[in-house]
A protein has these predicted regions:
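Positively charged, solvent-exposed patches that mediate nucleic-acid binding
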Residues: 1-114
């Protein structure tokens, strides 16, 4: 579970990031991010009802949270506010494939610490 300091929870925060943020796309995932002055990395997840029933959407969010939590422990992500948005095709991916998609979108705009 992500600690409270690393979670985006408020609708207003999501709206601000969608409005002001930059987008990075892959086949199954979209990343929207905006730089922040805070020292904490904050992450939110959005999985539309087009993806499937609630248990499928929750599975995707749990997997994404686990991947991000692992990256945060390794200090691999630069300090920004992030929203990961899942496409409907994401249900076809295994955990390892999903992890590679997350790393791909983060690398695409240089958001991984070396």
């Amino acid at each position: 579970m992500l600690v409270k300091e690393n979670r985006l929870t408020k609708r207003k925060e999501f709206g601000y990031i969608y409005k002001k943020g930059r987008s990075v796309y892959s086949k199954h995932l979209m990343l929207v991010y905006v730089p922040t002055k805070l020292k904490n990395i904050r992450v939110g997840f959005s999985v539309s009802k087009k993806v499937g029933k609630a248990h499928t959407r929750n599975l995707i969010k749990r997997r994404l949270r686990a991947i991000i939590q692992d990256l945060l422990k390794q200090n691999l992500i630069k300090t920004n506010n992030y929203i990961f948005v899942a496409n409907s095709s994401i249900t076809e991916l295994s955990f390892e494939e999903l992890k590679s998609q997350v790393l791909y979108v983060l690398n695409k705009d240089g958001l991984i610490n070396e």
